[in-house]
Amino acid sequence: LPMHSLTGWSVPLIIIFTGILVMVYSALGGIEAVVWTDAIQGIVLIGGALLCFIMLMIDLPDGFGGFLKVASANNKLSLGEMGLSLSKPSFWLILFYGFFINLQNFGADQSYIQRYIGAKTNKDAKKSVWLGSLLYLPVSMLFFMIGTALWVYYQEFPALLPTDMAADKVFPHFIVNQLPAGLTGLLIAAIFSAGMSSLSTSVNSSATVLLSDYYRKFSKEKLSENSSINFLRLSSLVVGILGILVALAFNGVASALDTWWALASIFSGGILGLFLLGLLLKTIKPKTAMIAVGVGLLFILWTSLSPFFGFSSLLH
């Protein structure tokens, strides 16, 4: 969206260009290229976000104090509703979701685990887990604060924001129209980095799973190193193309974040439970575990998709 606002290029064209770029360096450089680019992109992302928040505070009439005053008066700094409703994003529901989704990410997600395996020693792998865990909360808080600061900013300067603008487009609009030229480029690079980092990680981890769990397992001949590398590169290209097609299909959704949460819950549903079964209950048979995962997936599909087909959901 920032690139679209800045250049006027169509969003589908930007999706295709970005996807091809990520596919190329993921396929040619492998996990080393992904880790190094992710590290650099992460630094750019956090640095850009900090600068953006500072600029917002500078531009507000009363600075940080005024931001806190307006945000507090409009209940924008609260932790959310404290009720126990399952149909609203209450504090307890988000806390419950956050605990289990991060337990799955750090314990069962291939895109995380391959980084542990790629570390030189177990000690280095543990350090990466602690670093990621400790950074997660402050970085998330930073972006939440930017969202709140944007709300306060456009309460102070409502004429600067088109009335019919979708929520996902407010941040790109601010970056392109309110920031100095050099800082605009840095912030666009930061947001671009976030998207590229997520895509490259998914491409590389998916290709690794296809090689380790399918191609090597079902191949009748022992694979040479060159054959494995070629398969990884081909898989990276195929997965990257599929990712581009999915992104194009979901272009224009009302909320990218809500859509991501819904898709993540559907496609990753049951995976954490499966890993915990294997870790804690050694006597569970594979068939029993797969039935449990299947039932869990059906339940998630029902709760997530039933409103789109006119059926009542258990949560509503």
Regions found by a protein language model. Give the residues of each.
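Membrane-embedded helix-loop-helix hairpins and adjacent transmembrane boundary segments
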Residues: 1-316
